[in-house]
């Protein structure tokens, strides 16, 4: 009976993935056609999405990222993210996935190792090639400095959002897709040059953190006593340190 249930579950997962692929492919084809027929209108629509996100990195213009939408590499990267979201096990009010992470010295830990008593633990998932994540690091650092007396903070370095050999953006950091833990460590050390105000750890090469927390391309969480008390929306639109601030204000 158990093996039958596993088989059914596996079949349902394949069906889910097939449906995601179909609708995403359709979305890309339609987007590509609209970009060709109405380039100015589509540019305005895409720009408005970024304005809504509240991220205005002066280093990035539409020409750096707009033309990369609805390409094959766009399709492949978004498909990977959407398929990985099927593994999401992180829900508000439920137990936080105790996934493995690696510190910068190469030692293996788990998320719960960073929980301290009743203190909230803020998790920030991201990578250097995700412009909004890097752009808002200063804002995140302010959070750390303001609330470090009542909460702990941890940055988890995950797979590159816009690797140079994948869905790359112009005028962005040149970091290739991680093929080994050493690659990911090198990328995290690049992040350290930006002086984050809290510890940085790495997702393992199995990308279990990214999967169980549906973290790609960037995301914020707050854990407390082993449970999730805040789950931010998926970045870049949903990466909002100000929401974390509001939650922590109530904990003072």
UniProtKB/Swiss-Prot annotation:
Supply the EC number(s): 1.21.99.3, 1.21.99.4
GO cellular component terms, A-Z: basolateral plasma membrane; endoplasmic reticulum membrane
Under catalytic activity, the entry for this protein gives: 3,3',5-triiodo-L-thyronine + iodide + A + H(+) = L-thyroxine + AH2; 3,3',5'-triiodo-L-thyronine + iodide + A + H(+) = L-thyroxine + AH2; 3,3'-diiodo-L-thyronine + iodide + A + H(+) = 3,3',5'-triiodo-L-thyronine + AH2; 3,3'-diiodo-L-thyronine + iodide + A + H(+) = 3,3',5-triiodo-L-thyronine + AH2
What is the role of the protein in this entry?
Plays a crucial role in the metabolism of thyroid hormones (TH) and has specific roles in TH activation and inactivation by deiodination. Catalyzes the deiodination of L-thyroxine (T4) to 3,5,3'-triiodothyronine (T3) and 3,3',5'-triiodothyronine (rT3) to 3,3'-diiodothyronine (3,3'-T2) via outer-ring deiodination (ORD). Catalyzes the deiodiantion of T4 to rT3 and T3 to 3,3'-T2 via inner-ring deiodination (IRD). Catalyzes the deiodination of 3',5'-diiodothyronine (3',5'-T2) to 3'-monoiodothyronine (3'-T1) via ORD.
UniProt keywords, alphabetically:
Cell membrane, Endoplasmic reticulum, Membrane, Oxidoreductase, Selenocysteine, Thyroid hormones biosynthesis, Transmembrane, Transmembrane helix
Q: What class of enzyme is it?
A: oxidoreductase
What taxonomic ancestry is recorded? Answer: Eukaryota, Metazoa, Chordata, Craniata, Vertebrata
How the protein sits in the membrane?
Single-pass type III membrane protein
**What is the activity-regulation note?**
Lacks sensitivity to 6-n-propylthiouracil.
Spans through the membrane: 18-38
Quaternary state and interactors: Predominantly monomer. Can form homodimers but homodimerization is not essential for enzyme activity.
- Give residue ranges on the Extracellular side: 1-17
Q: What is this protein called?
A: Type I iodothyronine deiodinase
């Amino acid at each position: 009976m158990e093996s039958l249930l596993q088989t059914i579950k596996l079949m349902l997962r394949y069906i889910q993935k097939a449906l995601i692929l179909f609708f995403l492919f359709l979305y890309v084809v339609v987007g590509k056609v609209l970009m060709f027929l109405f380039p100015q209108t589509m540019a305005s629509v895409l720009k408005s999405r970024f304005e809504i996100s509240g991220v205005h990195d002066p280093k990035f213009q539409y020409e750096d990222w707009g033309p990369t939408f609805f390409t094959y590499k766009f399709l492949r990267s978004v498909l990977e993210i959407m398929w990985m979201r099927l593994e999401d096990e992180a829900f508000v009010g439920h137990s936080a996935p105790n996934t493995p992470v690696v510190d910068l010295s190469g030692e293996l830990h788990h998320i719960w190792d960073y929980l301290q008593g009743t203190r909230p633990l803020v998790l920030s998932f991201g990578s250097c090639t995700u412009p909004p994540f890097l752009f808002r690091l200063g804002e995140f650092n302010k959070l750390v400095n303001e609330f470090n007396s009542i909460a702990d903070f941890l940055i988890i370095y995950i797979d590159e959002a816009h690797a140079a050999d994948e869905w790359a953006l112009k005028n962005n950091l040149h970091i290739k897709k991680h093929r080994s833990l050493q690659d990911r460590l090198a990328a995290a050390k690049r992040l350290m040059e930006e002086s984050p105000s809290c510890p940085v750890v790495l997702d393992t090469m199995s990308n279990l953190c990214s999967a169980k927390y549906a973290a790609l391309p960037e995301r914020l969480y707050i854990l407390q006593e082993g449970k999730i008390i805040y789950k931010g929306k998926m970045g870049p639109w949903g990466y909002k340190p100000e929401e974390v601030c509001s939650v922590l204000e109530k904990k003072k």
